[in-house]
């Protein structure tokens, strides 16, 4: 059973190949994700991952961790992209259960999510809600 304070953590190293592959698969051809020369001349100073890339890693952690308790689906997420993720970054993905609202056929679970880089800088925050189902 999911409990308030339950935490899910995962650490992931991000490579240039990861960034290019994800951007290509989702047809995001923004040169910030593909062209080192172009990206170097921008305020970012080099290649960066697209926001959905590292958000999807966080969502994958949510799904794989909390489905250990039974079926669940995401129902609402508010996301803040704060800093870029770059090739060579090692990011920590984290979810913490903050509230559980009982319903007749399950629960609505509220969670705080975050991603920090190897320097301890927060690169993404989110508040999400999932619906769990009684089995």
At which residue positions do the language-model features occur?
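Catalytic strand-loop segment that frames the active site of acyl-thioester-processing enzymes
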Residues: 1-49
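HotDog/MaoC-like acyl-thioester-processing domains
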Residues: 2-7, 85-135
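Generic structural detector for well-ordered beta-strands
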Residues: 9-13, 80, 129-131
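N-terminal hydrophobic or amphipathic segments with adjacent small-residue motifs
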Residues: 17, 39-40, 45, 82, ...
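Hydrophobic beta-strand-centered segment that forms part of the acyl-chain substrate-binding groove
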Residues: 42-46, 55-96
